[in-house]
């Protein structure tokens, strides 16, 4: 069973480490390099505990970290970042976590992917629990829907 919880300020270090794993996985697509300190970094991370429209979430399975979501609330709500550790992929963890996050914020949503990230596009097409519209922006596909 997947537990989705708001990431508390004292969980920032765990989330920062999960973001490093996410950035490492994503570097196959965006060709990002690590910084001189050996980290990819995520400059906006601290804003998720400061700005009221940003919300960080952690996913756990049996008490173990399994991934995260970073949500920017608005009209529409935006799934800014979403990551599931490889161990938990293709097991239903991602879909359950995504749907739990959508349920926390009823109303209009969007999920976005880069054109090169076809696996993410396929994932979101399965994970969105309602009918959705899909279009593309300059970076890739965007799904828009309303969560109840």
State where each predicted segment sits.
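Conserved GNAT-fold acetyl-CoA-binding loop/helix
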Residues: 20-45
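Conserved beta-strand-loop-alpha-helix junction that forms the acyl-donor binding cleft
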Residues: 110-125, 129, 137-145
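Active-site beta-strand termini and strand-to-loop segments that position acidic
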Residues: 60-62, 145-148
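A short beta-loop-alpha structural element at the N-terminal edge
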Residues: 2-18
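A short helix-loop-beta-strand connector motif used in the catalytic cores of GNAT acetyltransferases and
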Residues: 44-58
């Amino acid at each position: 069973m997947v537990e989705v919880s708001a990431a508390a300020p004292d969980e920032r270090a765990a989330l920062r480490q999960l973001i490093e794993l996410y950035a490492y996985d994503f570097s196959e697509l965006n060709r990002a390099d690590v910084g001189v300190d050996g980290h990819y970094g995520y400059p906006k991370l601290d804003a998720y505990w400061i700005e009221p429209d940003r919300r960080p979430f952690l996913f756990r399975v049996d008490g173990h970290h399994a991934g995260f979501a970073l949500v920017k609330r608005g009209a529409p709500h935006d799934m800014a970042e979403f990551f599931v550790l490889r161990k938990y992929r293709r097991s239903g963890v991602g879909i359950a976590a995504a749907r739990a996050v959508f349920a926390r914020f009823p109303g209009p949503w969007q999920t976005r992917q880069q054109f090169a990230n076809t696996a993410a596009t396929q994932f979101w097409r399965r994970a969105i629990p309602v009918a959705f519209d899909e279009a593309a922006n300059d970076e890739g596909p965007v799904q828009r829907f309303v969560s109840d």
